[in-house]
């Protein structure tokens, strides 16, 4: 392998994904293992992580340009590690950069997971060529990343705000962070399963509802995911006025519902703000071209791919 290669890893709530990635966003080698880490087991988790990293480095004789790491959480201003890591609380306050540097002596880039997803989609997927691009990551949690002229928009903790907690239904269902009626509580996995319990009369996991809606063989699942799409269109109508993206990409496990989700999202978005965006596009003199909403082009390794983008494009 003579081309530049980077190693990326994505620490998820249930699974940690590790891969060798080239500058074209292709994953050349991949492995994963269960995250399962508590404060008492942090050392064993880090040992496992470093062993898996070394195993991939050995495949290319250690000839990589650097290591990119991503996780769900806020990164400190010095970019040394998470000061708040929602899916792995044991990582709070850990200087991950120093640990990786001491172990592997390679350049290290840390990025929060929504910006990793957004950078991957912007660089290699449906966001290519757009000046202002938004990516809505839809899973257990919900968050949006924004790219402005090639750079991720970063506020507190390296994120473009905590957009998943925008209130859609005041006094509505409570999310895991205590917000009442926020987008995450309505659109995320908990919202899907809550609707499932109401409409099926018994518990059904979100992944099954999503799969059935995509395959088109379950009217209840289709109805649930259509409602999720309507909520999504409502959220994006508000966010689009703040960030004025030219394209919005839906990514994550919930977006795998496909056409039923996308159609309902576009329907609600168009009904609420379609005329606004067309009007501004018409009179902007080419500065703004309007907005369209699409499904992600990338698969479930988006996080680790996005973790290394800045190594190839510093």
Question: Where do the language-model regions lie?
Answer:
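Glycine-rich phosphate-binding loop of actin/hexokinase-like ATP-binding domains
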Residues: 128-186
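A charged helix-plus-loop insertion that forms the helical arch/lid used to bind
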Residues: 80-93
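Active-site glycine-centered loops adjacent to acidic/histidine catalytic or metal-binding residues
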Residues: 113, 139, 307
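ATP-binding/phosphotransfer module of carbohydrate and carboxylate kinases, centering on a glycine-rich
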Residues: 1-65, 75-81, 98, 102-106, ...
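Conserved A3 ("GATE") glycine/threonine-rich loop of ANL adenylate-forming enzymes
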Residues: 14-15, 116, 140-143
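General beta-strand structural signal in soluble alpha/beta enzymes
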Residues: 108-112
């Amino acid at each position: 392998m003579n081309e530049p290669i980077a190693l990326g890893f994505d620490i998820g709530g249930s699974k940690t994904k590790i891969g060798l990635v080239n500058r074209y966003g292709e994953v050349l080698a991949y492995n994963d293992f269960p995250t399962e880490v508590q404060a008492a087991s942090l050392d064993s988790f880090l040992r496992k992580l470093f062993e898996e990293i070394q195993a991939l480095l050995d495949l290319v004789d250690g000839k990589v340009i650097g290591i990119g790491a991503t996780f769900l959480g806020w990164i400190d201003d010095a970019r040394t590690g998470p000061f708040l890591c929602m899916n792995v609380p044991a990582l709070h306050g850990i200087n991950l950069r120093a640990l990786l540097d001491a172990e592997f002596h390679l350049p290290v880039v840390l990025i929060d997971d929504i910006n990793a997803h957004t950078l991957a989609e912007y660089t290699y997927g449906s966001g290519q060529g757009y000046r202002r691009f938004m990516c809505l990551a839809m899973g257990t949690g919900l968050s949006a990343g924004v790219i402005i002229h090639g750079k991720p928009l970063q506020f507190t903790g390296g994120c473009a705000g905590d957009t998943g907690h925008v209130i859609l239904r005041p006094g509505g269902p409570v999310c895991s962070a205590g917000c009442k009626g926020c987008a995450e509580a309505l659109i995320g996995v908990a919202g899907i399963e809550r609707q499932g319990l109401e409409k099926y009369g018994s518990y059904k996991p979100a992944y099954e509802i999503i799969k059935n809606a995509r395959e088109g063989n379950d009217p209840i699942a289709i109805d649930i995911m259509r409602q999720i799409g309507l909520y999504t269109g409502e959220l994006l109508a508000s966010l689009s006025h703040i960030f004025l993206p030219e394209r919005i990409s839906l990514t994550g496990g919930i977006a795998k519902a496909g056409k039923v989700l996308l159609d309902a999202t576009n329907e609600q978005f168009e009904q609420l703000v379609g005329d606004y965006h067309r009007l501004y596009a018409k009179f902007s003199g080419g500065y703004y071209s309007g907005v369209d909403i699409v499904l992600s082009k990338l698969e479930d390794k988006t996080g680790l791919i996005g973790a290394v983008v800045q190594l190839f494009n510093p």
